[in-house]
Amino acid sequence: VTLKPLDGLPDELHWLDEVAREHSVGGALRLSLPIRSTSGKLIVDGWTAFPYLAGEHQPGRWLELAKIAREFAPLFAEAKRPDFVDMRNHAWARADRFAWGVDDGGPPVAAPHVADLVSARRQVLDPPGIIHGDLTGNVLFDSSHPPAVIDLTVYWRPAEYSVAVIAVDAVCFEGAPRAE
């Protein structure tokens, strides 16, 4: 069992327990979903529990991560847009809403090149759905088991967006060459 402090909204945890569990049955991926306490609670004194899943993060497996992103999204093809995606107020959620033009409050941080990036935005026509917004460091590989997806970070975006995040993470955090 892996214990961690609740770092999101309780609604997210309940969604993982109910909706994600229902939609992930029989999938080709192992998903780390919350474990209830002996009293049936998902949160106990601010802490949550998740199963230990065998495997390890292996930098450089970006093409496999892209394949996993493309396998993850269809698991939830029938799932409705979770209400909690609009209620989150952490920096990643604010940046996501700003990047997609759904938050008119201005950039979440003052950073160089934001205006250039905003002017480069284009309309995306691909349909949105459930994606994992941070797969790069959250997939465990094990030769005896299917890939394990941990720390599920759910967003309502087109599936290929999660692949784009993997590409950017690969270059920025794992030393991938820009041309790969």
Language-model features: locations:
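Conserved kinase catalytic-core helix
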Residues: 20, 55-90, 112-125
